[in-house]
Each structure stands twice: as C-alpha cells, then as structure tokens.
C-alpha cells in the first residue's frame, strides 16, 4: 500500500503515470495483479483546491476521480482523500478503480 500527496495551489488536473510504468514500477507481473494506494489532497480547507485525476497512456479510470480539498467542519463529507486500486489488464494496460 502506498500514499500519494498533492498540495495544489488551485483547482487542477493531475495525470496518472503510464500503464507501462505502473506495470514495471509496481511489479505487476501477471494480469490481475494489483496495488492499492491512498491519494491525499493537502489543499487548505478554506481554499477549495480540488484535484481531478486524468488518465495517462494505457490507463482506464473507473469511478469518481475528483478529490475535494478537506473540509474540517463537523458534518463534512469531504475528507480530502481517496483510495484507489491499480489492476493490471495486460503488459501495456491497467485499470485504476476508486474504491473509497
């Protein structure tokens, strides 16, 4: 399991790496292998610095790829973090699922 952090200075998109780099860098040696990680948006509560994940080459995205900046209010639903799973489809393709 890994942790990725980003401290944006405004709303913006963040592209994933390429599928080939995920396959080699995360040692996804067989189809179906996977890797889970948490993405934490470090944007300040009052600044609404949201991140939208976009797909790099060979990456298919499934689920909501919008990660809101954290909201520290008591009844808040925006934690500022998201959990993802990268799953190998082939040597040159992965699917990234938002799982939480």
What are these regions (language model features)?
Residues 1-66, 74-76, 88-100:
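Exposed extracellular interaction/assembly regions and N-terminal maturation sites
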């Amino acid at each position: 399991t890994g942790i990725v952090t980003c401290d944006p200075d405004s709303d913006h998109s963040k592209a994933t790496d390429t599928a080939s780099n995920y396959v080699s860098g995360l040692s996804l040696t067989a189809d179906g292998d996977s890797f889970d990680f948490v993405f934490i948006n470090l944007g300040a509560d009052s600044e609404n610095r949201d991140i939208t994940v976009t797909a790099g080459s060979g990456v298919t995205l499934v689920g909501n790829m919008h990660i809101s900046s954290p909201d520290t209010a008591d009844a808040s639903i925006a934690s500022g973090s998201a959990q993802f799973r990268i799953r190998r489809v082939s040597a040159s393709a992965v699917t990234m699922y938002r799982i939480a």
